[in-house]
Curated annotation (Swiss-Prot):
Gene name in the database record: rpsH
Record-given protein name: Small ribosomal subunit protein uS8
Gene Ontology terms: cellular component: ribonucleoprotein complex; ribosome
Record-linked Pfam families: Ribosomal_S8
Molecular function GO terms recorded: rRNA binding; structural constituent of ribosome
Gene Ontology BP terms: translation
Keywords recorded for this protein, A-Z: Ribonucleoprotein, Ribosomal protein, RNA-binding, rRNA-binding
Length: 131
C-alpha cells in the first residue's frame, strides 16, 4: 500500500520515538526527507542522520537529541499536506514561537528554514513547524 503523506509519516515517527526516549528512528528515505533531516541537524534539533541502503531500499536513520533527559524537539507538526497545500510568499512566511522555533520551507532554491528563506528573498511551501 502506498503512503499518502510520507513527510507526515517521518514527523510522526520522530515524535513517537521521542515520547519513548529512543536514540534513533528509521524511515524510508527520499530526497525531501534527507533535506528536512539536514535542516534539523543544522538547527541543532537532532544529533545526526545517515542514509543506509539495503537490497535497493534506502532507509533514513536519524539520531535524536535529548537535553537533561528531555527531547530537544518539543513540538513538530505538519503544515502543508496533500489535501491542503500551504504556500507563502517571501513576506508572508510565518515565524514559529516568535522566532524561537523554525518553519521548514521548500523553495525553488531547496529546503530551508523560514529565516533563510526570508534572507534569500524566496517563498515556497511550508512543510512543517519545529520548536
Amino acid at each position: 500500500m502506498s503512503m499518502s503523506d510520507p513527510i507526515a509519516d517521518l514527523l510522526t515517527r520522530i515524535r513517537n520515538a521521542q515520547m519513548v526516549s529512543k536514540t534513533t528512528v528509521t524511515a524510508p528515505s527520499s530526497k525531501v526527507k534527507v533535506a528536512i533531516a539536514q535542516v534539523l541537524k543544522d538547527e541543532g534539533y537532532i544529533d545526526g542522520f545517515q542514509v543506509k541502503t539495503d537490497a535497493g531500499k534506502s532507509e533514513l536513520e536519524i539520531t535524536l537529541k535529548y537535553y537533561a533527559g528531555r527531547p530537544v524537539i518539543e513540538r513538530i507538526e505538519r503544515v502543508s499536506r496533500p489535501g491542503l497545500r500551504v504556500y507563502k510568499g517571501r513576506d508572508a512566511i510565518p515565524q514559529v514561537m516568535n522566532g524561537m522555533g523554525v518553519a521548514i520551507v521548500t523553495t525553488p532554491k531547496g529546503v530551508m528554514t523560514d529565516r533563510k528563506a526570508r534572507a534569500t528573498g524566496v517563498g515556497g511551501e511550508v512543510l512543517c513547524y519545529v520548536a
